[in-house]
Amino acid sequence: MNTPIPNQIIREITPLSDKDCFYIAERYKTEFTYPIHNHSEFELNFTEKAAGVRRVVGDSSEVIGDYDLVLITGKDLEHVWEQNECRSKEIREITIQFSSDLFFKSFINKNQFDSIRRMLDKAQKGLCFPMSAILKIYPMLDTLASEKQGFYAVIKFMTILYELSLFEEEARTLSSSSFAKIDVHSDSRRVQKVQEDINLHYQEEIR
């Protein structure tokens, strides 16, 4: 008799280097396969043409539309994007991961960063931005994915965070806590995926 597979949350080791301000990955895919996971880095995740995908953040579970933008700063907050009923073969995903050290205390506590500080704090439970915010930052996000490196890329990324912080009151908190542990459903794409395969492909598929 086989022992039931326990609920597992992968602790992801991200590609973010200590010498980089952020790590950005742009992918075009036909499906989401990476299992439920968490990591110590902050994450901003954008999806396009992914209507029908189920987004799980902590104890929040929602089916998303064509566009979705979420910020997660909870270091133990598990999350996953599940294929669910999505039929699109042209999914675009842009993931930006960055360390909390990017904003050292003497910097983030300045008055000019009030809105960013509040947003990062609120995002410990996951923060979903409205379409108006997505439209505001889309041109910058679109070009940042191709730039990736250099001083001006960092400035553009910080500008994106600032612009999003102006939508803090409109953005929705997702999870009821920053450390909610949900039950893992019997989704074969997640539960039966072996650790060796995860380690082999994690740089191509962050989720």
Q: How does the language model describe each region?
A:
Residues 2-16, 76-140, 169-171:
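A hydrophobic/aromatic-rich effector-binding and dimerization subdomain
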Residues 1-71, 76, 113:
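Generic protein-terminus/edge-of-domain signal
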Residues 127-131, 146-205:
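Short, Lys/Arg-enriched, Trp-marked, Pro/Gly-tolerant hinge/linker segments that flank
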Residues 43-44, 136, 140, 163:
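Amphipathic, well-ordered alpha-helical segments in soluble domains
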Residues 48, 98-100, 146:
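Short beta-strand-to-loop capping motifs
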